[in-house]
């Protein structure tokens, strides 16, 4: 196979991967995070427990068994967020279509959440980036097309002109 053909095939594969990720992003918008809040709750051992509280609604037509989430804790007026973190939540019994649920996620005390001391005015924004179905396989995955994929696609397009 010639180099030009190989490059063309790789471009097509990367463009398809990008298109699939774009479809996933659109579908993931149907998973609404209605509210998100971060607190440090007192514990008997003296070290507070970080807790991420979310109210989530599933507006898809499929049961979701696990949600992969992207969280950003930031304050207005600051250009750098206090924390940017990816995390997941296994949903007991799944989140059914049109169902709304409140989740209390308790990250480990020694995680980045456990050492986070953001001011009271900091706001937690949470975005779903992938959800799995009851078969534990990805239903929608916006993370499949990476920055590296995008750079490679741009590089190949320049070379293939």
Model-derived features: positions:
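Short, solvent-exposed, Trp/other aromatic-anchored flexible loops in extracytoplasmic proteins
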Residues: 83-156, 161
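Low-complexity, acidic Ser/Thr/Pro/Gly-rich terminal tails and inter-domain linkers that flank the onset
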Residues: 3-53, 144-160
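Asparagine-centered strand-capping/turn motif at beta-strand->loop junctions
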Residues: 55-60
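Generic short beta-strand segments
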Residues: 37-38, 69-72, 108
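Short acidic, flexible loop segments centered on an aromatic residue
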Residues: 63-78
């Amino acid at each position: 196979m010639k180099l030009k053909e190989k490059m063309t095939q790789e471009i097509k594969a990367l463009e398809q991967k990008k298109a699939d990720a774009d479809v996933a992003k659109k579908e993931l918008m149907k998973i609404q995070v209605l509210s998100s809040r971060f607190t440090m709750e007192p514990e008997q051992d003296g070290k507070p427990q970080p807790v991420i509280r979310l109210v989530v609604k599933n507006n898809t037509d499929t049961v979701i068994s696990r949600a992969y989430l992207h969280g950003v804790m930031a304050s207005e007026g600051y250009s750098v967020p206090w924390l940017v973190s990816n995390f997941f939540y296994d949903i007991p019994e799944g989140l059914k279509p049109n169902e709304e649920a409140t989740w209390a996620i308790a990250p480990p005390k020694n995680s980045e959440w456990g050492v986070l001391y953001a001011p009271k005015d900091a706001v937690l924004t949470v975005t779903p980036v992938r959800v799995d179905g009851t078969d534990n396989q990805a239903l929608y995955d916006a993370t499949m097309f990476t920055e590296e994929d995008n750079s490679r696609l741009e590089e190949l397009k320049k070379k293939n002109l």
